[in-house]
């Protein structure tokens, strides 16, 4: 397959000479466009003949052939240059348009190129959709046609899910949570309590019963003996006083 010349496809390239950008204006833009390194410029044009003979651009109207003119200028950003075929002083045929934005030269696409690009983009998208659909289509003489998406579902299951990064809580959040838990504990006390680590939880009612002191039960016989002892003690008189020896 023969290599494609760069001049046959000028829509995908641009050209710029940074040394001209500060002095670029309506009077110098055609000289800037006629630089030798510019791939958009045709050396066989009438502008080159006028330049070599040191004539003004007004002589282009009296010549026949390819020429470049300044079609529109919006200094200092935008300039539009047209390439045209002059057949007579009053008859010209436009061939191509070039626009210069901030010193960079581009070729403006023609209507056929724009339509061709849009159609190719649409056809490529439709073709990709049909290829993707056909990859899931299955056929069997006994079953007919059906869609098979099992492989796609298995691939989704195999893909690891991205883990969310856990951010540490602030001091205010921890204090707030502790206060809420304490409030809930007071409103709804626990029904089971674990007295010691490792032991089974015990109901709260049982722990309260164990904590209360058990009253001592006194037998009636013991009560009667204590009463008799108290009566004998009270019946006896006070102890006699012994006389002291002088």
Swiss-Prot record:
**InterPro entries linked to this entry:** Mediator_Med6, Mediator_Med6_met/pln, Mediator_Med6_sf
The cellular location(s) given in this protein's UniProt record come to: Nucleus
- Which Gene Ontology terms of cellular component type are present? core mediator complex; mediator complex; membrane; nucleoplasm; nucleus; ubiquitin ligase complex
Spell out the disulfide connections: none
Which keywords describe this protein according to UniProt? Acetylation, Activator, Isopeptide bond, Nucleus, Transcription, Transcription regulation, Ubl conjugation
Per the record, the covalent cross-link Glycyl lysine isopeptide (Lys-Gly) (interchain with G-Cter in SUMO2) lies at 208
Q: Where is the composition biased (Basic and acidic residues)?
A: 206-226
Against Gene3D superfamilies, the record matches this protein to: Mediator complex, subunit Med6
Q: Please classify the protein's predominant subcellular localization into one broad category.
A: nucleus
Question: What does this protein do, in the record's words?
Answer: Component of the Mediator complex, a coactivator involved in the regulated transcription of nearly all RNA polymerase II-dependent genes. Mediator functions as a bridge to convey information from gene-specific regulatory proteins to the basal RNA polymerase II transcription machinery. Mediator is recruited to promoters by direct interactions with regulatory proteins and serves as a scaffold for the assembly of a functional preinitiation complex with RNA polymerase II and the general transcription factors.
Q: What is this protein called?
A: Mediator of RNA polymerase II transcription subunit 6
The scientific name of the source species is Homo sapiens
Q: What is the lineage of its organism?
A: Eukaryota, Metazoa, Chordata, Craniata, Vertebrata
Q: Which gene encodes it?
A: MED6
